[in-house]
């Protein structure tokens, strides 16, 4: 139905269908910006969080710069950085994440060099859910004039993430905690570190020039936008705003705690959490004598959807000692119920 009413190409043409569509896209931009405390013009629609992170990393980091990442990063950070190390002479240091936030910040601080350009880190691990001290890391970046690029894929919509937390660039997915459609993402910048375009093409503005426009969002958005996805993202953000991130976090954490309480009674199960650390609502585990893939397949046969393997985050699995086989990951949503969690726990017990 949305495409019947808003099937125009935003910013291209002056007829009514396009005008209606453009208004909806701008409203979605305003909704996303307001939710994270950013400005609409500095809110960029992306294909996903990986696209947003590539925009930020490749648009900020230059040849011979130095960057610091954590040892919990997703390949959406690790692979762009690795490519820049190979191809542009960029230097990269990896800071270990501790259960003690002060130790984590100290590890990042100890790796700062005169040519450090950016700290690039996840707000919460997609493997274990461990929450990094991102506000303190943002303060560290500000102290040293370093850009902080934040991967918010596992945190946005669940944790109260705001641009006022201090990150310079926030990247996130639309299809996870924001309940939008797949193929959507966001990059929000405070513009203190100008981002060079990653893609070049039509914007519907300054079309006579060969260069990309020098103003946002046009400078970083080119080609036809994912209109249907953007409208779904607007609806998802409105839902999260109405429900409340605190309520979502509480419900999902209650689901995790229920499963954890059941898993702790099963000697054959290993759970990858450490006392003293803060966690987003994610539980990673393994069952003795079963690979993570076998466990997930058996649970799938019983109607439970869990992801197995390395979760595109080999550094995190190396850190917790599961690089050879990965883990099984449970990540509930606001729509899961406690009876469903109990049924999952019983299914795991009976494997």
Task: Please provide the spans of the model-predicted regions.
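Pyridoxal 5′-phosphate
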Residues: 1-351
